Regions:
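Hydrophobic N-terminal alpha-helices or hydrophobic patches in metabolic proteins across all domains
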Residues: 1-334
Length: 334
């Protein structure tokens, strides 16, 4: 191993140990949340997915010329460390976790530059989606989703002629062969946050692994060339569509539970059906995402379809022209 390579290796090892030491508590608590909070249980797979992406792209990443930006990268690292200190002082876990992303991004910019950071946007995005959001933000999102799901359930049951009444996120109905009114509460776990976060992550992974190698970055060296890239917009549409798909499929699940509760009793909302319907909704949502990907590919521009083959075509070398004899004005060969 050459001396420069050995220095880079030891520098990477030292930096890794420094991050582990500084963020040991943050990483332990993050792992605990992934293991115990079902809304973010997909986070357990994120390190392996990120590792696979980086490993599969290792040759391409190694070919990126190092263009370090010491000033911007150093400023980002300092801001990350300050955010870590502020998060610890204020006992705010989300700030501490975001500081880790800022520190990692700053390190990449400091040593390699923005070119490498652009290639790592997907791993950074996956890590961001795995961070549990603050409780105050979670509640602001979850409760409106609970109300939306309960409204959809009441509307669906009304369309089927089922007598039902809604009070907030509580659905009152009278099951068949029962003289008592039963209540179904659309609790926080049924808000759809879990399926929303999981499906967003799945959409990013699906869009990344089904894109063409020809659509990896800006075209013709232009800064905003990616805005004219079909594969960029395909990935954007797939990821954005994950939000309404997750919300609507969860509302469909709650509606189905309400209908079955009318015919078979409210106990249907617990036990096997509750778990089975959750997995069924995930499968349905992914099928819809997959269908959107297929639909977009049907409208794929010709230039996007043939971009890879065109890029592999080598232009006719200019030297071939110079091999022909040049005739002067007098007709003699030069």
């Amino acid at each position: 191993m050459s001396v420069p390579a050995a220095k880079k290796l030891w520098r990477g090892i030292a930096f890794s140990f420094a991050i582990i030491f500084a963020y040991a508590t943050v990483l332990v608590k993050l792992s605990h949340d992934w293991w115990n909070d079902e809304n973010y249980s997909h986070g357990l797979l994120i390190p392996f997915i990120i590792g696979y992406i980086i490993w599969s792209q290792r040759d391409k990443l190694a070919r990126v010329p190092a263009q370090p930006s010491v000033l911007i990268g150093g400023a980002a690292v300092v801001c990350g460390l300050f955010a870590l200190w502020a998060g610890v002082a204020g006992a705010e876990l989300y700030t501490q976790r975001l500081s880790l992303m800022l520190l990692l991004a700053g390190t990449v910019i400091y040593f390699w530059g923005f070119s490498l950071l652009r290639l790592l946007l997907v791993p950074f995005g996956l890590l961001f989606l795995a961070l549990p959001i603050p409780a105050i933000v979670f509640n602001k999102i979850a409760f409106p989703l609970q109300l939306f799901a309960s409204r959809c359930a009441v509307w669906s049951m009304g369309m089927l002629g089922i007598p039902v009444l809604r009070q907030g996120n509580i659905i009152e109905l009278k099951p068949l062969n029962s003289f008592d009114t039963k209540k179904l509460e659309v609790v926080e776990a049924c808000s759809g946050i879990r399926s929303l976060m999981t499906l967003l992550t799945l959409a990013v992974v699906f869009a990344y692994f089904t894109h063409s190698p020809s659509g990896n970055g800006p075209k013709s060296g232009k800064r905003f060339g990616f805005l004219r890239d079909y594969w960029f917009w395909r990935a954007t549409i797939i990821v954005v569509s994950a939000v309404p798909i997750a919300i609507l499929t969860n509302a469909f699940r709650v509606s189905g539970t309400g209908v079955l509760a009318h015919y078979y009793g409210t106990q249907i909302a617990d036990g096997f059906f509750h778990s089975f319907s959750g997995w069924a909704i995930y499968i349905m949502a992914f099928i819809l995402l997959f269908g959107i990907g297929i639909l977009l590919d049907r409208f794929k521009p010709v230039q996007a379809e043939g971009a890879r083959s065109v890029e592999r075509k080598s232009p006719e070398p200019e030297s071939a022209v110079s091999m022909n004899p040049v005739v002067s004005a007098e007709g003699s060969e030069l």
